[in-house]
């Protein structure tokens, strides 16, 4: 038998090792990270644009255990820099490309980068229903709700637009994604409401041709 005593005290302060944010300024991305790795998923503004990106994006981190995602977005999306790049494209495309590379999160600036190409795939671990042997891609989330935001855990709840499964257009997917400090992997709980019958589920780890690079 164990005896536990609850008493008032001062909570211990922890350095932030897991955190994330909704980025309306970047077509509704939700991006999150811990001390080892970072991820993002895509939202309704990107879907409205017509770009096809269904899965999770994976960003590498090294040489640091501190949060880096906020700084990467700030560099990539800086309006003054974007305006300068646009101007240079008219007169000096090479200089424009060099300036872009100097601020882009697709280039390693010493602590990692976004080197993973998602596109119209399941990306890095996204789940999808597969009735009759065909993947039904979930596209981008419809709503997001951040439930935990550090210092040691990030959790977000994503609800998706209804899917059409074998003629039934009422199937709604909900995901609760959790990333803890010290883990390279998310824990994701996936629920499909209104699914009428048992249906296979697949998860994507996409390898790109021709050499199988991720």
What are these regions (language model features)?
Residues 143-145, 213:
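Short secondary-structure junctions
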Residues 1-25, 199-214:
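Extended acidic/polar, glycine-enriched regions
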Residues 6, 43-45, 158-162, 205-207:
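A mature extracytoplasmic/lumenal domain signature
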Residues 1, 30-32, 38-41, 124, ...:
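Long, contiguous hydrophobic alpha-helical segments, chiefly transmembrane helices and signal peptides
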């Amino acid at each position: 038998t164990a005896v536990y005593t609850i008493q008032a005290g001062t909570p211990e302060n922890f350095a932030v090792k897991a955190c994330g944010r909704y980025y309306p300024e970047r077509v509704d991305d939700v991006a999150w990270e811990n001390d080892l790795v970072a991820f993002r998923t895509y939202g309704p503004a990107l879907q409205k644009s017509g770009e096809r990106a269904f899965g999770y994006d994976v960003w590498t981190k090294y040489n640091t255990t501190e949060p880096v995602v906020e700084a990467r977005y700030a560099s990539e999306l800086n309006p003054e820099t974007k305006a300068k790049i646009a101007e240079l494209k008219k007169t000096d495309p090479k200089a424009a490309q060099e300036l872009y590379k100097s601020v882009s999160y697709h280039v390693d600036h010493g602590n990692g980068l976004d080197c993973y190409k998602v596109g119209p795939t399941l990306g890095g671990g996204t789940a999808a229903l597969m009735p009759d042997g065909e993947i039904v891609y979930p596209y981008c989330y419809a709503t997001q709700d951040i439930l935990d935001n550090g210092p040691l855990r990030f959790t977000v709840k994503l609800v998706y637009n209804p899917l059409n499964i074998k003629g039934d257009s009422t199937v709604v997917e909900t995901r609760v994604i959790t990333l803890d400090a010290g883990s390279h992997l998310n824990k994701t709980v996936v629920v499909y409401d209104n699914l009428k019958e048992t249906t296979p589920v697949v998860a994507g780890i996409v390898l790109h041709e021709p050499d199988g690079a991720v």
